C-alpha cells in the first residue's frame, strides 16, 4: 500500500441471506510504513500474545516478543525505525507491558528462572529488575501513587514500589494461575485466579 486511490469490491450479506454487492473508492494518504522485521542489534523476536504499548507522547511503540528470547523492541511510530531493544535472555511467553506517565516501561515475563519484572527507562536502559515466586502470565497494573501490582502464576499478588522494585507487600490467593490486575478510581486493587476474584484496599 502506498499513497494512492484504490477500488475495493464489497459484498454485504443480510440476516435474511440476501446479498448486495458494490464497490468503494478508498484514498490512502500520508502513508507512513507498512511492516517491520523485528531484528535489531543482532536480536530478533516473534511477537507474543501481549499487545504493544505506547509512550506517553505517542511517539514510540514498545513490542514485547517471546522467542527465541523475550526482548522488548522500541519503534518510532512515524518512521518505523528502531530506537532500541532491551534484551531478555530467555523465552518469555505471556506476561505484558505497561507504560507509566513518566515514560518508564514495566515488563512482566512468563518465566520463573530469571528476573520476571523489569522497569525500563525510556532510553532502553534498565531501571531495576526483580524475581518473584513464579512466572507472570498477565498484565500488571500501576496505581496513581506509584505502586506496581503483579499477580504470578502461583496466585501471589505482589505490590512493588514502582521506583525501586522493592516489595511493599505480598498476598497468597486461592486458586491457580493469576490473571491481569486492575485498579479502580479509588485505588482498590482487583485480582482474579481460577478460584475467585479478590479485592484489596490500596494499603491492604
Question: Could you describe each region identified by the protein language model?
Answer:
Residues 14-23:
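Short, exposed coil/turn segments at beta-strand boundaries within extracellular/luminal domains
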Residues 27-204:
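Flexible "stalk/tail and boundary" regions
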Residues 1-4:
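Conserved small/polar residues in nucleotide/adenosyl-binding loops
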Residues 10-12:
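Conserved structural position at the C-terminal beta-strand
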Residues 6-8:
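Amphipathic, non-membrane alpha-helical rod segments
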